[in-house]
Structure formats: C-alpha cells, structure tokens
C-alpha cells in the first residue's frame, strides 16, 4: 500500500516537472501558427502602404500608414483606392468617383461634381475647386464645365484635395483600368490618434 502511494507521488512529481515545458511548447506552436497565418493574410489578402503627399488631405496626409485589401476587389463609388498610374509612373491613392457607365459632370463654377445627375457631397473636401486642364477636352460643355462617361473596365478617380491632386481629370492619369487597382483602403494604423477603420463615401 505504501509502495503504491510512493509510486503515485513520484508520477505526480514527474508531471509537475514536465507540464511547464509542455505548456511553453504548446504556446510556441500556437504563436508560430499565428505568425504563419498573418504572413499568409498579408501575402494574399492585405498589405500596408504609406501615403506620399497631400493629394488626399484633409482626410489622409503625407506619411499616413494604411492597410489595403486586394481580396475579391471590385471598385465601388466612394472607395479609397491605391492603384498604379502608368502616366505618372508611380502608385497613387485616390477616391473612386465613378465606375464603368457612369456619367460624370464637373462644374468648377458651382464647385460641384455630379454622378449620373446627382451632386455628390463636398463636405469632406479641403477647399473650393479651381478649374484646371482635364482629361478629355472634347467633352467640355462650357467654360469651367466638363463631362465624362466612364468606359467599360475603367474607373474615374479624384483626390480629396481637388486643387492639389493629379487624377482622372488630368491627361497624365485619365481613366484608371480596374486591373491596375492594387487594393481598397480599409484601415489606418498611423498616426495612432487616427487609428481606425476607413469608411467608403462620396
């Protein structure tokens, strides 16, 4: 009887010796798996980008750090998108104003942008628009008024800082191919004071 009790005590002591190591190994295994999952996500679904310049101010500023998603992406009006601009030879960030088939009218005299006959909000804009060279001069209706129809497979984008943005109004950018869109901005990670999810709106 005493011998069995001693054996049981020895087994318990042995468990106490091995349990901490097992716990550490389990934790390391879980941590390694979590890192692997994060790597997969940032390889195939998400990526981080840094804003260069002030073309999207006052909503995004130079050096802001953002997370974009490129999983199952179909650009929609109001989305903040990161895309390749072969005219500017760089990656740019802009707001999607129109998608294929949309009719866009920009009136610098009234400081308005219309999409399919509806004036979009300008509450998020930095200042009143100033007239500037546009993508398709043949669509000029009158001084300061321009109209566009977005072709199939393309989008029309503009910076929130209308007077400090090279975008679809410019001959250097023009309409953007949907396939050149790298991702939609979904989250801001820096500055920490503005950390949070990014909503789509126009």
Regions picked out by a protein language model, each given a short descriptive name:
Residues 40-57:
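Aromatic-capped interface at the extracytoplasmic side
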Residues 2-25, 58-202:
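Soluble "head" domains of membrane/secretory-pathway proteins
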Residues 29-45:
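Hydrophobic membrane-insertion alpha-helices, especially the h-region
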């Amino acid at each position: 009887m005493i011998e069995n009790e001693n054996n049981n005590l020895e087994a318990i002591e042995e468990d106490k010796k091995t349990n901490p190591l097992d716990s550490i190994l389990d934790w390391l295994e879980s941590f390694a798996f979590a890192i692997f999952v994060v790597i997969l996500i940032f390889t195939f679904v998400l990526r981080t980008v840094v804003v260069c310049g002030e073309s999207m101010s006052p909503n995004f500023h130079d050096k802001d750090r953002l997370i974009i998603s490129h999983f199952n992406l179909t650009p929609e009006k109001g989305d903040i998108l990161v895309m390749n601009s072969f005219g500017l030879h760089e990656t740019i960030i802009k707001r999607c104003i129109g998608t294929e088939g949309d009719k866009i009218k920009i009136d610098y005299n009234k400081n308005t942008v219309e999409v399919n006959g509806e004036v979009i909000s300008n509450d998020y804009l930095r200042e009143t628009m100033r007239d500037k060279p546009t993508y398709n001069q043949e669509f000029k209706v009158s001084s300061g008024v321009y109209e566009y129809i977005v072709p199939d497979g393309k989008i029309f984008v503009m910076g929130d800082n209308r007077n400090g943005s090279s975008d679809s109004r410019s001959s250097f950018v023009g309409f953007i191919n949907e396939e050149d869109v790298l991702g939609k901005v979904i989250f801001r990670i820096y500055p920490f004071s503005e950390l949070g999810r990014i909503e789509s709106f126009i």
